[in-house]
A protein has these predicted regions:
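Exposed boundary/loop context
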Residues: 1, 30-33, 44
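Non-catalytic surface loops within mature trypsin-like serine protease
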Residues: 12, 60-62, 98-101
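Short, surface-exposed ligand-recognition loops at beta-strand->loop->(often short) alpha-helix junctions
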Residues: 9-22
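Short, well-ordered beta-strand segments in beta-rich or mixed alpha/beta enzyme
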Residues: 3-9, 40-74
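Intrinsically disordered, low-complexity acidic/polar segments
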Residues: 15-17, 65-67, 103
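Glycine-rich beta-strand-turn "strand-cap" elements at beta-sheet edges
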Residues: 39-52, 78-104
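An amphipathic, aromatic/His-enriched active-site/gating alpha helix that lines ligand/cofactor pockets
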Residues: 24-36, 59-95
C-alpha cells in the first residue's frame, strides 16, 4: 500500500470554503474516475494563528495506481484551479510512503 501525502494552506477566511470544495467536488471527482488501485482519501485540518493547514492522505495499492491518478511525474501535486484559487500556498510535490503497518 502507498500513502500519498500533500499539504496546502489557506487563509482563515478561506478555510471553510476550501474544505467544502474538497468534499463536494474534488474528492467526488477523484472517486468518479474509478482509478484501479485507488483506495480512498483522508483530510486533516489544523488551525494556526494566521492560516489553516490541510493535509491529504491518499491510499493506493501501488505506484502504478498513483501514476494512473497523477501521471508519469507522479510526485507532482494535482491541484485543480478552483482549489488553487482558495489556497494561500501549497506543496508543489507530494510525498509517497510505503505503508508498513495499518491497524485501522
Amino acid at each position: 500500500m502507498i500513502c500519498r501525502v500533500w499539504h496546502g494552506w489557506t487563509t482563515l477566511e478561506n478555510a471553510d470554503a476550501y474544505e467544502r470544495l474538497l468534499e463536494s467536488e474534488v474528492f467526488t471527482g477523484i472517486a468518479n474516475r474509478r482509478i484501479e488501485g485507488y483506495r480512498g482519501i483522508q483530510l486533516l485540518r489544523r488551525a494556526h494563528d494566521s492560516e489553516v493547514e490541510f493535509v491529504t492522505m491518499m491510499w493506493f495499492t501501488s505506484l502504478e495506481a498513483v501514476r494512473a491518478f497523477a501521471g508519469d511525474d507522479y510526485t507532482r501535486a494535482v491541484v485543480p484551479p478552483k482549489a488553487q484559487s482558495l489556497l494561500a500556498r501549497y506543496d508543489q510535490r507530494s510525498a509517497h510512503y510505503d505503508v508498513r503497518e495499518d491497524q485501522r
